[in-house]
Amino acid sequence: MAVKIRLKRMGAKKSPFYRIVVADSRSPRDGRFIEQVGHYNPVAKPEAEVRINEELALKWLADGAKPSDTVRNLFSKAGIMEKFHNAKNAK
């Protein structure tokens, strides 16, 4: 089972927010997911709001889940990708 960490679109028309979820790569974008890792609100003022459960994100990355490009960028800004690579190279 190929597992991805990706964004699930929520919210009203023209006012989206996203949940960062772990899902099977074959399931639809807004369909079934395994676990919610955080959320991302690009419309929030004064700047975009991002909340990520770092512990869960690192656990899923260690288990082999592949992040989408956007999620990888969000994780990089939060410092999660750096922690993951440091832990991976320390072994």
UniProtKB/Swiss-Prot annotation:
InterPro entries recorded: Ribosomal_bS16, Ribosomal_bS16_CS, Ribosomal_bS16_dom_sf
Alphabetical UniProt keywords: Ribonucleoprotein, Ribosomal protein
Gene Ontology cellular-component annotations: cytoplasm; small ribosomal subunit
Gene Ontology MF term list: structural constituent of ribosome
Residues making up the signal peptide according to the UniProt record: none
BP term (GO), one: translation
Family matches, as HAMAP family: Ribosomal_bS16 (MF_00385)
Annotated family: Belongs to the bacterial ribosomal protein bS16 family.
Protein name as annotated: Small ribosomal subunit protein bS16
Protein source organism: Exiguobacterium sp. (strain ATCC BAA-1283 / AT1b)
